[in-house]
């Protein structure tokens, strides 16, 4: 199981492996592949405005592997597999009852990367949540809360190179849908955007 955000931390400082060479350019690679791994934190803004249930998300964690195809110096297309874990405190508004809802998520973003000055990277694209699982326990019995995130999201991120093999990255994930969840007999709709931040390492 991958170490678990979030968010699609963007394709970043990555080990580079040329796959083609530009003619007449002194052998400098024009197209190359890049790889990276990273870890970070993720915070979810989870809202259920019409429900009888109050939700308090906690800071979670994420881990990811990335791959990108880079064209020249300024443009790349990439993807990643990101595993994240976290928790939400759910409580009933009309009584003193709360439970910790444990969440696990797997996301696969696909994004366009714009690179500036070999230091800053801007990342934009869709993010697909292929697994979103949340559950809590009542008297030793597991209860299913339902998916925390919709299947399709949009994401934008920024990466800043700290060293030759290390980048600091942040990302915002916006949901393109609503979720339906259940807690102690109450069914309600939720919306869930995310903010992630972390470090990406060249290897």
Predicted ranges, named:
Residues 20-22, 45-55, 85-105, 132-149, ...:
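Flexible, solvent-exposed loop segments that connect beta-strands
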Residues 32-36, 52-98, 106:
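Glycine- and aromatic-enriched membrane insertion/assembly motifs of diderm outer-membrane
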Residues 14-69, 120, 124, 175, ...:
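Short glycine/proline- and aromatic-enriched beta-strand/turn motifs that initiate or cap beta-hairpins
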Residues 38-46, 82-88, 111-117, 121-136, ...:
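Short glycine-rich beta-strand segments
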Residues 156-166, 189-203:
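Outer-membrane beta-barrel "beta-signal"
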Residues 1-10:
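Bacterial N-terminal signal peptides
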Residues 73-77, 119-122, 160, 164-170:
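Repeated loop/turn-to-beta-strand initiation elements of outer-membrane beta-barrel proteins
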Residues 67-69, 112-114, 160-162, 201:
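Residue-level signature of outer-membrane beta-barrel architecture
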